[in-house]
């Protein structure tokens, strides 16, 4: 009997110890959670204190609200009704709403008021060739020297005109009517003196480019050969 009583006492004591241990663990975990929450609360700053005054636009009179008359009763009946049409007009994506003016279309592409609103000229092939010739005018006449042209791009705003000679100008400074053409390129091509000068310059450039190449070396070999091998 004594052994049975001792075993029962030991079992009850062990149960009590386990229950006490579990309660201590639960209490410790709850204390840790509270301590962590307090730490987080201390880190977060207070944005609005009791002494802080809200600005005027947060007051109730500026906040928009809904009136009871504006609320729709039985909204489900409107949703289920097939004949219901919205009062707000729906515009298509490619159609602009009325009252919106497209200002970009009315703006003209000009050089500005300082240049008397000079419009942008259309760049045709003949106009491009004339502009390229004007940029290379240093090569047209060996007796005239011009400032170097640095811009490679075509101008956007420009005008083309013809100089009208006065009666006091000497006849040598005028271009005869037979030699007048529509473009600058045509006038240069119809001038025989210019054409001979351009041909001479072209041959000089070709000679300098071909120097030291295969063709020149072959010609040199032919000249070095003796007369009986030629």
From Swiss-Prot:
Primary location group: nucleus
Family the entry assigns: Belongs to the FCF2 family.
InterPro entries xref list: Fcf2/DNTTIP2 (IPR039883), Fcf2_C (IPR014810)
Organism: Schizosaccharomyces pombe (strain 972 / ATCC 24843) (Fission yeast)
PANTHER family noted in UniProt: DEOXYNUCLEOTIDYLTRANSFERASE TERMINAL-INTERACTING PROTEIN 2
Gene Ontology terms: biological process: RNA processing; rRNA processing
Compartment list: Nucleus, Nucleolus
Protein name per the record: rRNA-processing protein fcf2
């Amino acid at each position: 009997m004594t052994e049975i009583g001792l075993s029962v006492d030991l079992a009850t004591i062990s149960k009590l110890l386990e229950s006490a241990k579990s309660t201590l663990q639960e209490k410790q975990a709850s204390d840790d959670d509270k301590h962590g929450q307090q730490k987080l609360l201390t880190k977060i700053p207070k944005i609005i204190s009791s002494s802080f005054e809200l600005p005027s636009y947060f007051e109730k009179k500026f906040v928009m609200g809904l009136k009871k008359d504006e609320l729709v009763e039985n909204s489900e009946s409107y949703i289920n009704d097939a004949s219901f049409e919205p009062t707000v007009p729906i515009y298509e994506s490619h159609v602009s709403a009325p009252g919106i003016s497209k200002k970009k279309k009315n703006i003209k592409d000009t050089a500005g008021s300082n240049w008397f609103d000079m419009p942008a000229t259309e760049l045709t092939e003949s106009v491009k060739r004339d502009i390229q010739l004007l940029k290379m005018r240093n090569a047209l006449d060996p007796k005239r020297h011009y400032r170097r042209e640095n811009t490679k791009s075509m101008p956007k705003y420009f005008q083309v005109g013809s100089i009208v000679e006065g009666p006091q100008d000497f006849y040598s400074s005028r271009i005869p009517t037979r030699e007048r053409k529509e473009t600058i390129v045509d006038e240069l091509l119809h001038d025989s003196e210019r054409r001979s000068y351009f041909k001479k310059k072209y041959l000089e450039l070709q000679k300098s480019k071909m120097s030291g190449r295969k063709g020149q070396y072959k010609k040199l070999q032919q000249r070095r050969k003796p007369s009986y091998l030629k």
